A protein has these predicted regions:
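N-terminal small/polar loop signature for handling phosphorylated ligands or for N-terminal nucleophile
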Residues: 5-80, 191-202
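Glycine-rich His-Gly loop
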Residues: 1, 59, 100
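Catalytic cores of large soluble enzymes that bind and process phosphate-bearing ligands
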Residues: 5, 31-34, 61, 146, ...
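Alpha-helix N-cap/helix-start motif at coil-to-helix transitions, marked by capping-box chemistry
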Residues: 7, 11, 131, 149-156, ...
Length: 206
């Protein structure tokens, strides 16, 4: 999205790709709560540039838009066709999700939320194939997050941890993960909000 571009984070990634002489195309029009139109536009660029893989840079919105492109690249049709549970039949292209926030956990989840602009509803897409092939959480990329966004995404992470802990589907393993997440958020979130350059706090929030 444009925030990533304006913050100079995109250039960090493109410099690496340029040094490796890798060709790429950039879609930077994703909005918070990405829409079916975002997905369609991004997929048109994917086809036009003859792309063979997907890299998303950002938070949950960027990753969800990338997942939407993955559905269309691997299976065709429209994103609306995949609303529901496990509607895809074929695998995605290779997909790398690079995080710049610490909250949504979309980079490791099989959920994709896309706004249907005609019905004015959020479509819930649950499909194991949309889990990224590789997820990268680098605290250095999160140091530019402003305090308000750091706090908001941190509370999002806390909400996910509490939800997992009180879920009727919880297991001893998920409880252990949720407890550790709450412990780390309690220890590091306030530090990350107070000083965005605190690498230990940023890493703890990853």
């Amino acid at each position: 999205d444009q925030g990533i571009v304006n913050a100079g984070i995109l250039k960090v990634i493109t410099d690496i790709l340029d040094a490796a002489k890798m060709k790429y195309a950039i879609y930077d029009k994703t909005i918070p709560n990405p829409t079916d139109k975002n997905v369609a536009e991004a997929f048109e660029l994917y086809k036009k540039e003859k792309c063979d893989s997907i890299v998303t840079l950002g938070g949950g919105s960027s990753h969800d838009c990338g997942k939407g492109v993955g559905f269309l690249a691997g299976n065709g049709g429209k994103i609306h066709d995949y609303e529901g549970v496990d509607k895809s039949k074929k695998p995605f292209p290779p997909y790398v999700a690079v995080n710049t926030t610490a909250g949504a956990a979309s980079e490791m989840a099989r959920f994709c939320i896309i706004t249907d602009t005609s019905r004015k509803v959020k479509m819930a897409i649950v499909d194991w194939r949309c889990t990224p092939s590789v997820a990268i959480d680098d605290p250095v990329l999160m140091m530019g997050m402003p305090p308000a966004l750091t706090a908001a995404t941190g509370m999002d992470a806390l909400t996910h941890a509490v939800e997992a802990y009180v879920s009727t589907a919880a297991t001893p393993m998920t409880d252990a993960c949720a407890e550790k997440a709450m412990e780390y958020i309690n220890r590091y979130l306030r530090r990350a909000v107070a000083n965005g350059r605190d690498k230990e706090a940023r890493e703890g929030m990853c």
